[in-house]
Structure formats: C-alpha cells, structure tokens
Curated annotation (Swiss-Prot):
Ca(2+) 3 binds at residues 76, 79, 82. It is a peripheral membrane protein. This is Ras GTPase-activating protein 4. It is found in: Cytoplasm, Cytosol; Cell membrane. The keyword Zinc-finger applies. Zn(2+) binds at residues 682, 693-694, 704. SUPFAM superfamilies: C2 domain (Calcium/lipid-binding domain, CaLB), GTPase activation domain, GAP, PH domain-like. It comes from Mus musculus (Mouse). The keyword Cell membrane applies. Ca(2+) 5 binds at residues 149, 202, 204, 210.
Length: 802
C-alpha cells in the first residue's frame, strides 16, 4: 500500500499587475513553490500588465506537503528580478475542493516573516523535582532553513521563550542545516497554560535579525505525554496585521489535489482482468462494460477517464483492441459520414491521448525542425488583406516601402515553403511512425471503409485518419508548440500568426480540401495549389501508413524495443569530485548527457563514439545542491555506487529551474525501484575538511536532509504505472456506482421480461454484476488499509503544536 499525492496545475493568466519598469510595463513570469521549494517556472511574457500563460503541469508529491505558492515576478536583465506578489494555497484548502480550485485570486505582498521553511529537531520533557517540576527543551538541530544572506546561507540561532524567560543558543555561521545540541530548563508551574515558544533567527551584524520560523508547543499536552522528541515544522509569524500595498493584480489558477491510496497489485487484478475480458470480447459477445462506462462518464472528466483507460490497456498490450472497440461503437451510432469523430466522445478523447502517449517522439521528429525555423526566422506573415500592416515588414528596397500586394505574395511564398517542407517530412515518416500507431490507423481505416463503402464516401476513411493525425495532433502542436514540448517558450505575436496560418493550411489538407473549408476563408486561396497537392500526398502517405501486416507490426515493435529511445537527453555542465581541491563553478565542463532505462551516459557531443556510463541500477539519489556551494541555484547531484560499492557524487549544472526539475524527475522515476536508495543526503559539498551544509567533519556522515525521491513532474514519456491507473479507474467507477447500479437493474428487468437489449446476444447484466462485486471488494480492501495500526497512529508532534 502506498499513499500518493498529485497536483494538477494550470496557470492561466494575470491581470492588472503593477508596472515595475520605467516604461510603465512589466515582464511577468510565475514561479511555483511547494513548501518553499521552486519546482516550476513559466515563460516570461514581455511588456504587459495582463500576461497570458496557459501552462499546464502535473506534479507528484509526498502526501506530507503543506503549501503550494505562486509567485509572480518581473524579469530584469541587469538587476535582481522584482517580486510582484504571490498566491498561497494550503493543502487543507485544496483538499476542501475535491473537483479542484479554480478562479481569480488577488496577489498579496510577500512578507519576509511568512517566508519560512524547514524543520527543527527538539527533545521536550517534563522533569520531576522535589518542589516543582521543570520543563526541559533540548534544541538539537535544524534542516532546510531559509537562506537569508546574499551568500545563499544563514547564520541561525534559536530563542526559547517560556514563563517570562528567554534563552538562546549559540550562532552557527553560514549554514541552513545547523546543529546546536543545547539544552534549556524552565520552571514549570502547576496548571500553566502558556505555550513554550521556540523561534529560529538569522543573526545579522549590521541590520536586524531575520525571522526563520517558530514552533509553539502546548505545555499541558506535553505534561500528559511527559516526553516527546522529533522534527517540528517551522511556522510563519502571522501575529502582525498585513499592511496593504495597494492593488497588486490578480492571478487566474486551476489547481486540483488528488490523494490516492494505491493497494498492492493483486487487489486490482479482478478489475483489470474484467476490463481486459470486455475489450477482447469486442462487440461480438455480451460484454457491454465499455459502452456503459462511456455513458456514465460526464463531459468534464471524459478526457481524464480516456487517458487512464488508454494507459491501462496500453500496459496490458490491448490499446489497439480497446481503440478498435471504441471505433466500432462510434461507427455504430453514426449515420452521417461528415460528423464522424467530430464530437468529444470517448473514442476521440482516447485516440488523442493515444497519439500523445505513443507518438510524441514521432511528432517531434516531423515538426521540430519546421517549428524551430519559424521561431528563428521571425518573419512577418499575413494572408488576410484586412490585417496587413505594411509598417511591420520594413522595406523591400531602398527608400521604398512594400505594397500590400508584395506583403501578401511574400507571405504566401513563406507559408508555401513551410507547408512543402512539412508535407515532405510527413511523407518520409512512414517507417519512423511507431508500429502500434500504424496498426491502430489500419484498423480505423478498415472499419470506416466497411461502414461507408459507397463511392461517394471514398474520402471518408482518409478523413477519419486525418481527423486524428492532422486535426487533433499535428495542427494543435503547430498552433501551441510549447504545450507539446516543442519549444520552451510561447511564440510572440508575429510568430503566433505564422503558426496559426500554417495550422489552418494543415487543417484544410486534413479535411481533404472540401469546398466548405475553402469558402470560410477565401484569402487562403494563394495556398490552394499547395493544399491540393498536399491532399494527394497525404492520401498516398495514409495508404502506405496503414499497409502494415501483423508480422511486420511485431517485427517493428521488437526493433523499437531493442533500440529504446533515451528517457531524456541534452547538454549539461558536469563536475566530478574526488574530494581534492576547491570546488568552483568555473570547474564545470559542458558535456552531452543521455538517460536510458539502462544508464546515464555522457560524452563530448551527441555523436561521440566514446561515452562514460553510470549504471542506472547504481544510482542512490538525485537531489538539488545548495546555492552557496557553487554560487548557482540550478545544480543537482547524482549519488551512485561505483564498481566496488563506494559512494561517488557527480554534480550537474542546468540552465534554469525547469531543466533542473525535469532532469531530477527523470532520474528519480528511472531509479525508483533501485535497491539501496538513500533516505538522507548532504545538500552541500565536502570542501576542505567539512560539509558546507551542516559543518560535520566526517565525510561519511549521514546526510543532514531528507531525500525527495517522490517529488517528480509528469512527462509525456513517463513509464506506465499499472497499479495507479487501476486505482484511478476504480475511483472513477466508484463515483458513478449509483448510475451503474441503476443500469444493472434496468438490464436485469429487461432480461427477466424476455427482452434482449439491442446489440446484446447474451446477458449483459452479468458483466455489470461482476463489476459491482469487484468494486465492493476494492472498497473493503481500502477500508482495511485505513483501519490498519499505521493508518490510525496519532500524530503526536502535530497535536503538541498550538
């Protein structure tokens, strides 16, 4: 049994932000922090007070996280970025919105007294005495304190207040992981109701000390327990009233927290086997669970259910059969060929998810070079005469501005060149298209041709394929390359217009250049010769694409499996330390890294024949490094065991917080099942004769901070998690259980009356009855897990805090 938490985050837009630049504008971006740890940075939107981001993220976290905060920043090229304001959502607030938090929220000022993080290790006890008892507080150590000084560290000390007395620890210089091991005694009066207050501070020689956090302990509860020891989370100081600083603007967010208790695999086997049996039966037998699931799934959660089902069947090797069943169901209720797969049905949503899960690398290979060219050229492109702005295009010759006709002709030439290059890339891609996608399109093509065999519908099988390949895959990726991981930043206005016109042309080709699509925007006429040629090319491509037999499919799949693509790759800066000499950022060397399911390798270039490998099975942790260690906040460490079992560390520098977290996520997910994973680590480096983080002199000393192996970002190429997918399906079915029971009663009544439901030759209620029994068994299994001693164990440390 494992408890898992995930956050679905959509950062939509901001409005009415204050101007931070002398031009009266700002260059805003967002930083997302979980428990004050940066995990996401959005793109910067330049010169605006009402930025639109539209960025989506899925973050997997341990269930013990407390807050997620959104900081709106103003990017500055020459000085430190300005903080505009923040929105903070607690875990409890998110849990109170099961369907997710959505809407506009006012930004508030960032108060230093609320910017706290970390934990403090205390041992508290009541010591009996002859005349009076004493309250003893041992301040042992702290970890992950907020860095308050410019050097990326703090100089922490602790104040302990009780019963009118204040005592202090010594100051530990330049450490966010201090160890004090100091004990303080206070007289304990009978019936005392005052709390014991433990405050952490950053000592400053010149300016005021900075607040690092506090813990307030309920002494009455401590008297009952007599003694407690553990790590207490530092809390912000909210005793001072917040001073308003005018309107800081608003942020539109969509955030959903999902907590799941994932049971052992054996618990989900009956559910998975039942669903797989239904897919194998198809539309021939009495199994009708998939249609019932579709009917009871609301539009708002259809995409999520489709993705989960698709991943579940992909893991069982039945994705093609599942999609084929959905194709047949959709065709069975479609009478008009021109409406086929145009709705947001389960079939359409499942096919969308399938292409993203199985075909993203294929998409990148086709679109990547063309999208890069459009971004790099930054040409002004416009075909609509009503939108042409001659001033935007400069001059074609000396002292003579371009005419509108010249602008339109030049734009048409640019778009034709991009379209020809794109069609050429598509037509050459038959052999690089994943075999499972080709086989699925083959089934779709055949099913549609069987359903609409007349000559007047000869284009319908092609349009069925292009409705997914072009309209729901290529065109959206061209329109929004960042959402498909083709670019790190959104396009500017000029590039966006070029991409929009190119996407429209691809849609026209995907629609097989129908008169309706031509009539909508007559100004697209200059592209018509290329579009007509593209239709012929695309038809030829589709015929080759679907011309795949089962043996060829298996051979291609085996070849693909034997040449597993990298999980992640790209250039990074490396520093390998043997504990000799000083460590500095200048000692980093740029190399090309590649992470596969077998190893992390690095070489001078991506094409180098000689590489160095770190076996994936030998990785023990992948963690961030303190900013003060190298003067950069974008450095991670990979701790691994060498051939003789000794711990070694390699330090890698990334270019930004997003790249850092993407590499950390990839490494953590790839090594999640490794033996010997570390539970603690040193976020600093061993410089000279001690660790820079906690100042301990033993190089083999246990780490001073917890590892974060469960903090990961969801990516399109994540490995399938069969148990989690089964749990998500169970959770959805549990939510529609009442509708399933109602459907079961109707089917049972019809069978008893001797009326067989349309399309069912057997007893469809048997499948539903099995499903309802499986749901009941899983409900009982979850109930047993919640009733276990570990689940019921009280959180003493939380109860002690006031």
């Amino acid at each position: 049994m494992a408890k898992r938490s995930s956050l679905s985050i959509r950062i939509v837009e901001g409005k009415n932000l204050p101007a931070k630049d002398i031009t009266g504008s700002s260059d805003p971006y967002c930083i997302v922090k979980v428990d004050n740890e940066p995990i996401i940075r959005t793109a910067t939107v330049w010169k605006t007070l009402c930025p639109f981001w539209g960025e989506d993220y899925q973050v997997h976290l341990p269930p013990t996280f407390h807050t997620v905060a959104f900081y709106v920043m103003d990017e500055d090229a020459l000085s430190r970025d300005d903080v505009i304001g923040k929105v903070c959502l607690t875990r409890d607030a998110l849990a109170s919105h099961p369907k997710g938090f959505s809407g506009w929220t006012h930004l508030v000022e960032v108060d230093p007294n609320e910017e706290v993080q970390g934990e403090i290790h205390l041992r508290l006890e009541v010591v009996p005495g002859v005349h009076a008892s004493r309250l003893r507080c041992a301040v042992l150590e702290a970890r992950d304190l907020a860095p308050k000084d410019r050097n990326g560290a703090s100089d922490p000390f602790v104040r302990v207040h009780y019963n009118g007395r204040t005592q202090e620890t010594s100051v530990v210089k330049k450490s966010c992981y201090p160890r004090w091991n100091e004990t303080f005694d206070f007289e304990l009066e009978k019936g005392a109701s005052e709390a014991l207050l433990v405050e952490a501070w950053d000592w400053d020689l010149v300016s005021r000390n900075d607040f690092l956090g506090k813990v307030a302990v309920n002494v009455q509860r401590l008297c009952s327990a007599q003694q407690e020891e553990g790590w207490f989370r530092l809390q912000p100081d909210q005793s001072k009233s917040r001073q308003g600083k005018g309107n800081l603007g608003s942020l539109q967010l969509e955030v959903r927290l999902r907590d799941e208790t994932v049971l052992p695999s054996v618990c989900y086997q009956p559910l998975v086997q039942l669903l797989c049996q239904e897919v194998k039966l198809g539309t021939q037998g009495p199994g009708r669970l998939i249609p019932v699931i579709e009917e009871t799934t609301s539009a708002e959660c259809r995409q999520e259910v489709a993705t989960t089902l698709l991943k579940l069947f992909l893991g069982q090797g039945l994705a093609k059969d599942f999609l084929d069943l959905l194709f047949q169901l959709e065709l069975g209720r479609t009478s008009e060929a021109n409406t086929l797969f145009r709705s947001n049905s389960l079939a359409s949503k499942s096919m969308e998810s399938f292409l993203k899960v199985a075909g993203m690398r294929y998409l990148h290979g086709i679109l990547g070079p063309i999208i890069d060219r459009v971004f790099e050229e930054k040409k002004y492109v416009e075909l609509d005469p009503s939108k042409v702005e001659v001033k935007d295009v400069g001059c074609s010759g000396l002292h003579r501005p371009q005419t509108e006709a010249e602008v339109l002709e030049q734009s048409a030439q640019t778009l034709r060149a991009h379209l020809v290059a794109l069609l050429s890339a598509i037509c050459r891609s038959v052999r690089t298209c994943p075999a499972i996608i080709r086989a699925t399109f083959r089934q779709l093509f055949r099913r549609v041709r069987e359903r609409f065999p007349n000559a007047q519908h000869q284009n319908v099988p092609f349009i069925a394929v292009t409705s997914f390949l072009c309209l729901r895959f290529f065109s959206p990726a061209i329109l929004s390359p960042k959402l498909f991981h083709l670019r790190e930043r959104h396009a500017d206005a000029r590039t966006s217009r070029t991409l929009l016109l190119l996407a429209k042309a691809v849609q026209n080709i995907g629609n097989m250049d129908t008169p309706v699509s031509r009539a909508k925007e007559s100004w697209m006429e200059p592209l018509q010769p290329t579009v007509r040629q593209g239709v012929a090319q695309l038809k030829d491509f589709i015929m080759k694409l679907v011309d795949i037999e089962e043996k060829e499919e298996l051979d291609l799949q085996r070849a693909l499996n034997s040449q597993a693509p990298p999980v992640k790759e790209g250039p990074l800066f490396i520093h390998r330390t043997k504990g000799k000499g000083p460590l500095a950022s200048s000692s980093f060397k740029k190399l090309y890294f590649s992470l596969t399911t077998e190893a992390l390798s690095f070489a001078k270039t991506s094409s180098s024949k000689k590489s160095t490998f770190i076996k994936l099975a030998s990785i023990r942790a992948a963690e961030k490094v303190e900013e003060k260690s190298f003067g950069s906040s974008h450095i991670m460490q990979v701790i691994y065991a060498d051939d003789v079992g000794r711990a070694q560390t390699v330090y890698l520098q990334c270019k930004c917080v997003n790249e850092l977290n993407q590499w950390l996520s990839a490494l953590r997910k790839a090594s999640t099942n490794n033996r010997g994973l570390l539970r603690s680590y040193h976020p600093g480096i061993f410089r000279g004769d001690k660790w820079s983080c906690c100042h301990q002199k033993d190089k083999t000393d246990q780490g001073c901070d917890k590892t974060h192996s469960r903090v990961t970002l969801q990516e399109w190429n994540d490995p399938l998690d069969h148990d989690l997918e089964a749990q998500l399906i169970y959770r959805h079915l549990l939510g529609v259980e009442a509708a399933l029971r109602e459907r079961y009663q109707l089917l049972r009544g019809a069978t008893e009356a001797g009326v067989s439901p349309t399309g069912c030759d057997g007893a469809p209620e048997d499948s539903l009855a099995q499903l309802l029994r499986v749901l009941q068994d899983l409900r009982e299994a979850h109930g047993s897990s919640l009733a276990s001693p570990a689940a019921r164990e009280p959180h003493h440390l939380l109860e002690l805090q006031t």
